[in-house]
């Protein structure tokens, strides 16, 4: 159905935009990176398929690590090697520091204040990014909030211990991360585990909103390829995102208003959370910070923090259950270091090299964002001898880099051992492993995500033995994914925990 809509709209668009069918800047094809042949009007759109990260990886085998495509009216360059990723994110980082903002998310004023959508040269971006980096994700800030994370891990272990049969692992990790973000930001919890009688309609709606936002933001949008159709919202993405993002903004707005009213009371005692600190900053002289900026920042943090770490932990459990020998190695290491403690402390992580290797291998094998957030060229520049015109959209295919046999031995195999006794990490300096990006736009929440990934995987593996639900043992079935802003499992992992 989507293909028919696409072709019909492309035919209509041809009547309006045919006059502009030429290469960017009028240059000859020889100046631009190589790429596959294009159909009239729609270009290479049909070659993306349902899994663009895999389709682009296949095309890169023919056209190389710097490949050009035409997606409707958009000129796109796809980066598929560590060397070219370094050129884009580091050497030419300022030129490519502007994010591509899909038309469907240019709603509710979000694009005007969201640190995910503003260029790195924006004063607002610099201000909000600095606040997040220093006040929430710095080592000092994270040390101060370690008890909040420890309590969420305890609740996760308690919930799994209560399960008498197969449980939805991804739902449990999502609940853990969502509650962590709300406890850190607002000193409240928003969701309950599946066995709770208090799982209200509001809680279910919250899950629906976050899942819908990450799903719809990853859907290729005809209105982006042919901006002439933007007012008509042909796929309904703008309408859907307005509802789901608007609902989250309303939820956060209500929490902020409650706090503002409480702060006016003579008997008010300050909360030890991020919102309290932000409101204090908004009333001081150091930052010109508005309540509207606080609201949109909190929504950005909730969406990013709730979804990707939860999905990556679910993928980790998938691979460990499919590889019992790897799970046994991890459990033995945890037993030798942690002993009989049920909760793994963040200070234990540095003593657990196989746990660290397992997390790295999961991030390689199942990168949370298979295509890193796309960038735009602020000006014409050169990469590897090719012209990259101004306003070119840049995709970095992290999935391709992570599966490249010239970089990784046996890339299609899950082998944590490949990361033992080497210094490769995912902090943005080793471009063969950049699941969180690199350079100016590296994910600011990386330090928090790293702590929670290690601790959630360790908590689930140390306290329990696991069995896959009967009938779900197929590796092919378990590894099926759904493309989006985050790479989700197509079928949720259901597994049976057995208390050790």
From Swiss-Prot:
E.C. no = 1.14.14.61, 1.14.14.-
TM segment ranges = 4-24
What are the required cofactors?
A: heme
Q: What class of enzyme is it?
A: oxidoreductase
Which pathway is this protein engaged in? Secondary metabolite biosynthesis; terpenoid biosynthesis
InterPro entries hit by this protein: Cyt_P450, Cyt_P450_CS, Cyt_P450_E_grp-I, Cyt_P450_sf
Write the protein's name.
Carnosic acid synthase
**Source organism:** Salvia pomifera
Q: Gene of origin?
A: CYP76AK6
């Amino acid at each position: 159905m989507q293909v028919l809509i696409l072709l019909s709209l492309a035919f209509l668009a041809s009547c309006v935009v045919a006059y502009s069918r030429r290469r960017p800047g009028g240059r000859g094809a020889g100046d631009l990176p190589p790429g596959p042949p294009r159909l009239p009007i729609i270009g290479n759109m049909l070659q993306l398929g349902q899994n663009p990260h895999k389709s682009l990886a296949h095309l890169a085998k023919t056209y190389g690590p710097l490949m050009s495509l035409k997606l409707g009216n958009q000129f796109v360059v796809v980066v598929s090697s560590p060397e070219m990723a370094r050129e884009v994110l580091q050497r030419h980082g300022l030129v490519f520091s502007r994010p591509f903002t899909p038309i469907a998310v240019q709603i509710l004023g979000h694009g005007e204040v969201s640190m995910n959508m503003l260029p790195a040269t924006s004063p607002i971006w610099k201000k909000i990014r600095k606040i997040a980096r220093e006040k929430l994700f710095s080592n000092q800030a994270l040390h101060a909030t370690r008890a909040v994370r420890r309590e969420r891990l305890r609740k996760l272990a308690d919930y799994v211990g209560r399960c008498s049969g197969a449980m939805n692992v991804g739902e449990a990790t999502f609940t853990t991360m969502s509650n962590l973000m709300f406890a850190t930001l607002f000193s409240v919890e928003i969701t309950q585990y599946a066995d709770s009688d208090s799982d209200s309609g509001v809680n279910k709606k919250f899950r629906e909103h976050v899942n819908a936002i990450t799903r719809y933001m990853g859907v290729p949008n005809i209105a982006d390829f042919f901006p002439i159709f933007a007012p008509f919202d042909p796929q309904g993405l703008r309408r859907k995102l307005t509802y789901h993002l608007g609902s989250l903004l309303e939820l956060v707005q209500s929490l902020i208003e409650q706090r503002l009213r409480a702060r006016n009371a003579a008997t008010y005692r300050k909360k030890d959370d991020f919102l309290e600190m932000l409101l204090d900053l908004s009333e001081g002289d150091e930052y010109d910070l508005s309540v509207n900026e606080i609201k949109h920042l909190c929504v950005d943090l909730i969406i990013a923090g709730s979804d990707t770490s939860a999905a990556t932990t679910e993928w980790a459990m998938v691979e460990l259950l499919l590889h019992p020998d790897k799970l046994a190695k991890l459990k033995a290491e945890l037993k030798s270091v942690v002993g009989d403690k049920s909760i793994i402390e963040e200070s234990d992580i540095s003593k657990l090299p196989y746990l660290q290797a397992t997390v790295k291998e999961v991030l390689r094998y199942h990168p949370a964002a298979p295509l890193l957030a796309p960038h735009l060229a602020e000006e014409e520049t050169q990469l590897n001898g090719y012209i990259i015109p101004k306003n070119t959209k840049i995709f970095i295919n992290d999935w391709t880099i992570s599966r490249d046999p010239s970089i990784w031995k046996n890339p299609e195999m899950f082998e944590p051992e490949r990361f033992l006794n080497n210094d490769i990490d995912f902090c943005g300096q080793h471009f063969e492993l950049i699941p969180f990006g690199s350079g100016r736009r590296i994910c600011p929440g990386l330090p928090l995500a790293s702590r929670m990934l290690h601790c959630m995987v360790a908590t689930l593996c140390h306290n329990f033995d696991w069995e896959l639900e009967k009938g779900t043992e197929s590796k092919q079935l378990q590894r099926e994914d759904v493309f989006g802003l985050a790479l989700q499992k197509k079928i949720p992992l259901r597994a049976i925990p057995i208390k050790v």
